[in-house]
């Protein structure tokens, strides 16, 4: 298979510094909205919805007699059993006698609360507890690849002192301090700290020193040596020493301990082979990178080769088989609870069913969770299960049928790419910094946006998907329009994570030579550096889920800067030469 790059442009693509005849490309992707998923089944009639909504309202308000009366009068089945369990277990509710607990356990042993009810019954003197389904232990099924640093080897005190110099942008002082501690450090700790010094030199644009210190760490081997090799490759690339860059990136490709870094090493080794006119190495490296299909560089390699991305299998929209689920009480519970807005309880019912039911229904339950817009539940099914045989990678990328309060102005693919990374689709999660909900919006940021549009705002509203998505997309639009991002998608994503001020600094501090991939890999903040690649990877997979061609993927595979998608989802790309947009 041949690279999808014209031969006349090979070196220009490698260096990203030679003017092209065409420097603007319009890659239309045509926003068509969310791919319709299989509609969720309906279980309750209008009267039943009203009844059970009122029951849960009474329990929430601690109106115990009213709740009991309504449960007794309601149709008896999974929903009434669930409500009764909630009543019995609610804080401050009247004490339940053993006979009532026994009766409920005998009638509904399948309930998510069954073990709690059994414990309560045992404490109150019930000697023979009604049998309940066995609860299966689940395993981690794996997740999307992520670039991680190895475990720290240096002592906290030495690392902390070194970090003072690094944070003060003093890599030479950091190196001197490290040299004074050589006899006190293990070989592994010394390699780790040399990597950190090399990276400090690199972000200060002292590439020769970064290459020198990094090469010593690389020679020591081990996981930190591989990290140092990555720095050596980047520094050599910026110095124009493409042969050394190839050797360093090839070392990363051979010894990286995770797929994300391995794919990066392969991709950049192919770039270096292109720059050194070694065509025999280009395609094999790219093909190996493409096999690491759920990585940022794996997707770029597939695009560069003109291959159908292997990751499309992850992006397929699965359908559930209702006929094999409709007689399961917990499934009936989940569907019914969603109909009355009790999503957390629906989540508990589906997870419990997965643990007590037929293991062959695991993917089926995941697809049902998606149809019910239980995005965090579906995400959980994609990561945990009885065995890898029952895993469904599609569930790792939920595509709920939500809509911001102001309608979609930013393509859902990009919004969900952020929600996936920010919260794993947990609607009510709050970070230590106070950021809330799906897109981890800070209440202060939302307050400012609300004030600008003359609307009221309550922090608790950020727990509502429609509200959170609205403020999230509004903030992305604001970042898009700032001069410091110029509307370039990687910079908008970086600003969403790190804030606008760091991006403003990086515009002048990062020597990327107009290369968007070099910009991404040179971001000083570890978290933001990984964040940009993860969001773009998520974005591309969501575009596959929506059956869209990807303008940003196509552009980045040609080392062009993708702009933020417009209202129709269209992405334009621009070639930048030496840090400035090339003239037409």
PLM ranges: what are they?
Residues 2-10:
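Bacterial N-terminal signal peptides that target proteins for export
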Residues 12-19:
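Bacterial N-terminal signal peptides
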Residues 26, 36-126, 130, 134-135, ...:
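Alpha-helical, heptad-rich or low-complexity scaffold/stalk segments
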């Amino acid at each position: 298979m041949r690279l999808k790059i014209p031969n006349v442009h090979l070196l220009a693509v490698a260096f990203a510094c030679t003017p092209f005849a065409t420097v603007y490309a319009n890659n239309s992707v045509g926003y068509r909205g969310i791919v319709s998923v299989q509609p969720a089944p309906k279980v309750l009639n209008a009267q039943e919805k009203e009844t059970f909504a009122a029951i849960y309202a009474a329990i929430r308000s601690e109106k115990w007699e009213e709740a009991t009366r309504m449960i007794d009068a309601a149709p008896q089945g999974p929903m009434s059993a669930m409500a009764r369990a909630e009543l019995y277990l609610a804080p401050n509710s009247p004490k339940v006698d053993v006979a009532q607990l026994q009766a409920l356990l005998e009638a509904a042993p399948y309930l998510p609360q069954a073990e709690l009810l059994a414990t309560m019954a045992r404490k109150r003197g019930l000697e023979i507890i009604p049998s309940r389904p066995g609860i299966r232990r689940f395993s981690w099924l794996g997740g999307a690849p992520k670039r991680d640093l190895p475990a720290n080897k240096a002592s906290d005190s030495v690392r902390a002192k070194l970090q003072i110099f690094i944070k003060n942008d003093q890599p030479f002082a950091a190196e001197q301090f490290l040299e004074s501690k050589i006899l006190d450090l293990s070989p592994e700790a010394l390699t780790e700290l040399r990597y950190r010094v090399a990276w400090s030199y690199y972000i200060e644009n002292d590439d020769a020193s970064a290459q020198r210190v990094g090469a010593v760490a690389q020679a020591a081997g081990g996981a930190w040596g591989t990290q140092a090799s990555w720095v050596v490759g980047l520094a050599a690339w910026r110095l124009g020493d493409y042969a050394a860059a190839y050797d360093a990136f090839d070392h990363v490709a051979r010894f990286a301990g995770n797929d994300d870094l391995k794919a990066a090493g392969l991709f950049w080794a192919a770039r270096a082979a292109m720059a050194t006119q070694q065509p025999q190495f280009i395609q094999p490296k790219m093909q190996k990178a493409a096999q690491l299909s759920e990585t940022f560089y794996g997707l770029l390699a597939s695009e560069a080769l003109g291959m159908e991305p292997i990751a499309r299998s992850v992006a397929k929209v699965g359908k559930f088989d209702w006929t094999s689920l409709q007689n399961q009480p917990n499934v009936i519970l989940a569907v019914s609870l969603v109909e009355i807005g009790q999503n957390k309880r629906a989540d508990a019912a589906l997870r419990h069913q997965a643990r007590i039911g037929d293991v062959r229904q695991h993917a089926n339950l995941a697809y049902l969770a998606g149809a019910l817009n239980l995005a965090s539940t579906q995400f959980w099914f994609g990561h945990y299960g009885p065995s890898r045989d029952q895993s469904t990678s599609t569930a790792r990328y939920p595509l709920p049928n939500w809509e911001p309060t102001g309608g979609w102005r930013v393509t859902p693919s990009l919004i969900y790419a952020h929600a996936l990374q920010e919260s794993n689709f947990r609607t009510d999660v709050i970070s230590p910094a106070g950021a809330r909900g799906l897109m981890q919006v800070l209440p202060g940021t939302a307050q400012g946006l609300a004030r600008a549009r003359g609307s009221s705002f309550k922090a608790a509203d950020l727990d509502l998907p429609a509200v959170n998505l609205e403020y999230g997309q509004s903030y992305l639009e604001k970042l898009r329009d700032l001069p410091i991002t110029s509307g370039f998608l990687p910079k908008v994503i970086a600003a969403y994570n790190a804030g606008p001020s760091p991006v403003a600094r990086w515009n002048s501090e990062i020597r990327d030579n107009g290369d968007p991939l070099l910009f991404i890999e040179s971001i000083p903040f570890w978290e933001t550096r990984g964040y940009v690649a993860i969001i773009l990877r998520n974005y591309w997979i969501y575009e596959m889920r929506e059956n869209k061609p990807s303008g940003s993927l196509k552009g980045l595979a040609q080392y062009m800067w993708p702009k933020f998608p417009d209202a129709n989802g269209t992405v334009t790309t621009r070639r930048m030469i030496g840090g400035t947009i090339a003239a037409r």
